[in-house]
């Protein structure tokens, strides 16, 4: 019996070694520029695409294909949809979610479309977080506001300054995508806000926080989540030295709407521009004034 047990153990160890070797052989790496997302077969000092120096790093680009929100207890990741004739598709009454911010509503084309993915870019300190937090507090809907940069106490201090109240605004300080999806499944918010996309990580990708691979994977997972649950996802993104949203340009192609928050930190006025909008015009702008209570809508700029 002891010999059989020992033999079985040896077989298990050999099989385990084969599985590990096979698994490792499937891992592929590539070199990406952390500024523009350009891909290279080997390391080099300068990026040929954007000209940045020392921004190219090696990342794992292929692992086991496991979705971040497959780890949740529900069967959300299993599609229950079937193809539907376009004439039979019924647009629900909640086609647009009103934000109680007229400037923001107009820029989006009338409000937030359920299941849509919106990306907001802008310089540090320009007011991106303030804008999204203010919308979270003004809207008459349940909002899950996730921050990977600030603690709940820090966000509460800003919320007190804004002086709007929404009992359905839930603050969650977290940067692990799996935990965020688990809470979203439990809370079932009407809107999910991520501040910021560069702070998120998923265990399905073995690379550093903010890397190109993490950015693309987390964004793809959030898009998949939004489309399957009809929960709109609003992302805040940092910008690089050229004024573009940090990371690969493909991020802007992946999302439905790209907004740019502009202004001079030494002056009070802010302009919200729309660079891309699958559900509305790109000719609208929103104008705000930064005041002690947050962002004040400027309805008539000529006054």
Each predicted region: which residue ranges?
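Conserved P-loop NTPase
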Residues: 48-52, 56, 62-69, 80-86, ...
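Conserved inter-motif catalytic segment of the P-loop NTP-binding fold
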Residues: 115, 123-126, 130, 134-221
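Single conserved hydrophobic/aromatic residue that forms the stacking wall/gate
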Residues: 1-15, 45, 155
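Conserved nucleotide-binding/hydrolysis micro-motifs of P-loop NTPases
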Residues: 124-126, 149-153, 161-164, 175-179, ...
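Substrate-engagement module of ASCE P-loop NTPases
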Residues: 213-234, 238, 254-260, 265
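Short regulatory helix/loop adjacent to the ATP-binding pocket of P-loop NTPases
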Residues: 244-253
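Short cysteine clusters
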Residues: 4, 33-36, 47-50
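Detector for small/aliphatic-rich hydrophobic stretches
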Residues: 19-20, 25-28, 39-121, 138, ...
